[in-house]
UniProtKB/Swiss-Prot annotation:
Primary location: secreted
Record keywords: Neurotoxin, Secreted, Toxin
Name of this protein: Thaicobrin
Source organism of the structure: Naja kaouthia (Monocled cobra)
UniProt keyword annotation of Secreted present: yes
InterPro entries assigned: B30.2/SPRY, B30.2/SPRY_sf, Butyrophylin_SPRY, ConA-like_dom_sf, PRY, TRIM/RBCC
Amino acid sequence: SPPGNWQKADVTFDSNTAFESLVVSPDKKTVENVGVSQVAPDNPERFDGSPCVLGSPGFRSGKHFFEVKYGTQREWAVGLAGKSVKRKGYLRLVPEERIWQKGLWWLG
């Protein structure tokens, strides 16, 4: 655990917001990109242009950390999004779009 007053974020993912190729586990603690579209109702909360899913709780302040297990995936990202983040259409993963993220991409 990190030094100081950092708190581990106990994240629960919201399957109603999940992009079509993201599958949220039944316990809502993990997300997997299966690479193919899943049947999911279109709703205003769902991301339809970028592989994103929202989780809770939200934070307004403090120091929080996440534990990420990415297995054998060559590409992954984890981050924070503002509650009012755009859900429809392509989303650039940059602070100007209310997204702050870290990840690994293979550029080869």
